[in-house]
């Protein structure tokens, strides 16, 4: 099973995260299938590869709660409903 989850990057006390599609059995810093976004909680910046995220969601990938909140804040689910209708 594939999940969309955060992968920690950055320096000590200055964490930034990549949003990645990764196998559920892999560890947090393990090998990812594809990088689909970027999230910086300190600067509150988000960069998303929307077509890649929609592709993985359509294939059955489950976002973690934090990634789900990031995607909802970016109004990605409204866009997904608009594309599917």
UniProtKB/Swiss-Prot annotation:
GO terms for cellular component: chloroplast; mitochondrion; small ribosomal subunit. Keywords: Chloroplast, Plastid, Ribonucleoprotein, Ribosomal protein. Pfam families: Ribosomal_S16. It is found in: Plastid, Chloroplast. GO terms for biological process: mitochondrial translation. SUPFAM superfamilies: Ribosomal protein S16. Belongs to the bacterial ribosomal protein bS16 family. This is Small ribosomal subunit protein bS16c. It comes from Agrostis stolonifera. The lineage of its organism: Eukaryota, Viridiplantae, Streptophyta, Embryophyta, Tracheophyta.
């Amino acid at each position: 099973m594939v999940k969309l989850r955060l992968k920690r990057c950055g320096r000590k006390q200055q964490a930034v995260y990549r949003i990645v599609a990764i196998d559920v059995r892999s560890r947090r810093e393990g090998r990812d299938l594809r990088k689909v976004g970027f999230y910086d909680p300190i600067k509150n910046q988000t960069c998303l590869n929307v077509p890649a995220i929609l592709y993985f969601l359509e294939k059955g990938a489950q976002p973690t709660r934090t990634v789900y909140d990031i995607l909802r804040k970016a109004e990605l689910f409204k866009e997904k409903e608009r594309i599917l209708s």
